[in-house]
Amino acid sequence: MPLANYANLDFGQVKSTLREYLKENSNFTDYDFEGSNLSTILDVLAYNTYITSYNANMVANEVFIDSATLRENVVSLARNIGYLPRSRKAAAATISFFIDTSNITPTPSTITLKKGPVATSSGSFGNQSFVYSILEDITVPVSDGEANFSNISIYEGSLLTSNFTYSARNPNQKFILPNIGVDTDLINISVNPNQQSSRSVKYSRQDSLFDIDSNSKVYYLQEVDDERYQVIFGDGIFGNKLDDNNFITVDYITSNGHAANGVSSFVFAGRLVYVRNSQEYTVTSGISQLSTGISSSGGESIEAVESIKKFAPRIYASQNRALTANDYETIIPARIY
């Protein structure tokens, strides 16, 4: 049998090879292999061989990080060597404004800018309108009838919240943020003893196992399918282990990346409140126009597949140390972005 080229992925050549094999078989003497019936059978056999060969070739390619093409596979291979691809980055800007409290009754002693949306881009920017948010409440005192919010950092994107309840009876439980476009630098995680409790503990992100013990309130991130992220908590050795029925709150910002770079004019869209005698009041008047300190910049797309394939092995080889020129070439971009 002349069928020796197992790497052949050309449909026509596969069909031709099958035809030659059958012609040399004495059981098929005097058959017309160009006839419609046999030709159709050969087409099916060649197509099946082609698909099988293609799948085998792709499976072999996707096993190695330098030849893989699907993002999920590249990310998975990078995860095996401890590399977390850079997420999408939200464009950041700074704004300032003040509130004239002379006509506000009852008179506040402090005013709080609530977390969530704070401003929108004024007009259309590149045929788009952008929302800018903050991750945490900001409280300022009222002095001489004014409350000044100066040089507040705002981030393009919507503030979203995902809640999870930890179950000790489910060893395979996963905490996956359902939205794409998450900026991993703009994530706040807090854990309550249960859903009814108001007492919460803030957890911080950790990228390594150094200086971590069983009581460290830390979490880890890894990218999973469809550019989403999974939150991983400690196991009682490297980081604090969650207790049954712990209620997890994850606040995060999803952004449009580089599309929002360059916005310099903003309109207030936030929520201002103050508390007097245990009652909360909303501030709707006396709010000045927003002044821009720094135009929005720093927005970036999620790390590309080619970049992951380039930097993941090099980050692993450097082992978080900077000794050689290649180490510096690898670590500096990772720290900057």
Each language-model region and where it sits:
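Signature of Asx- and small-polar-rich beta-strand/turn repeats characteristic
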Residues: 1-337
